[in-house]
Amino acid sequence: QLSQPERILDLCTGSGCIAIALATRFVDSLVDAVDIDKGALEVAMVNVDHHDLGHQVNVIESDLFAKLPAEHQYELIVTNPPYVDAAIMADLPPEFLYEPEHALAAGQDGLDLVHRILFEAPDYLSPEGLLVCEVGDSEWALKQAYPEIQFDWLRFAHGGHGIFAITYDELMTHRQLFAAYVQLLDSNQ
């Protein structure tokens, strides 16, 4: 059971629906809704205004954590980053092609952004904090990449899969592993 977090980060917010749900659930929390896509953030701002949550939800343009104030410590970071791998991207049905590619594609294994988030999150997560991340069908790739980590995979009564939770302590314990993947990604670009 998560207590009332003071500050929540919705990373890769898109239209802001997760940030809005979090603000509605945690009425005394401040929620930062972050995305790199200006168009998505415009939609998020409309949605935040529609739900009259401008006093609680702050919409921020940033490439992951890049433009977040260093002093911000979040008790909860929730993220639904792009996680579609290269093979699935190549075979997507036409209706998915209306989405911007950067909102879906995440490299060969679907985890390019997830590796970065796992590495960078401890710098913004409070010591008692929790990171919740959706990786969808890339769950198997994450388990293969980090077999020594016991991710806490969330289960739902009705649908949903590929969502894990990991604590600040676990992120710090495995930070060198995450750093190695980020270095590998950077060297391949």
Ranges and model annotations:
Residues 108-174:
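Conserved Class I SAM-dependent methyltransferase catalytic core
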Residues 1-90:
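Conserved SAM/SAH cofactor-binding pocket of Class I
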Residues 82-113:
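Mobile active-site "lid"/loop adjacent to the S-adenosyl-L-methionine
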Residues 61, 98, 144:
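Phosphate-coordinating loops and pocket residues in cytosolic domains that bind phosphorylated ligands
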Residues 58-60, 102, 152:
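Structural signal for short hydrophobic segments within the conserved structured cores
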